[in-house]
Amino acid sequence: TVLAKPAEQTPGVARVAVDLLHAAGVPADALQLLHGPGETIGAALVAQPQVAGVVFTGSTPVAKLIQRALAAKDGPIVPLIAETGGINAMLVDSTALPEQVADAVVQSAFRSAGQRCSALRLLCVHEAIADGVIEMIQGAAKELVAGDPSQLATDLGPVIDAEAFDNIQR
């Protein structure tokens, strides 16, 4: 059985995803959805002796808490897969086509308002083509349309919460 505990900011999309999986044939007793704060729900789940593995996406401090909780358990070692938002980098050499680089940068850095764990965070461009690439990226970024993500013309939707907004402002 998989117990899915989404981030507190995403209960609606998690519900839709689980409903779609159930509609596609995944049995309800094989996939269950639990909502609530990670500090209580997540901690209680990790502490259960029946837990055979944990997959976590979130902050490094919380991943470390989960790791310590699992290590303190009696019995067999419980595997932990933790994705904690590493730095997704792109290295561009002098043979790259600036148009392709600009498109890839904009797609990776700005889709999903840059909130995916795989969003581009670090761009290293060979000095021979850097000026042209930067100019193209700036031009492409200026063309992005911010707005309601339900509208097809929108390229850049809202961020998930006030904390994410504050992080962008820094």
Across the structure, where does each feature detected by a protein language model lie?
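A generic structural signal for short
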Residues: K5-P6, A30, V55, G157-I160
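Conserved donor sugar-nucleotide recognition element shared by glycan-biosynthetic enzymes
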Residues: T10-V13, G38, A164
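Flexible, active-site-proximal loop/turn residues at the rims of small-molecule/cofactor binding pockets
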Residues: E8, P37, T57-T60, I129
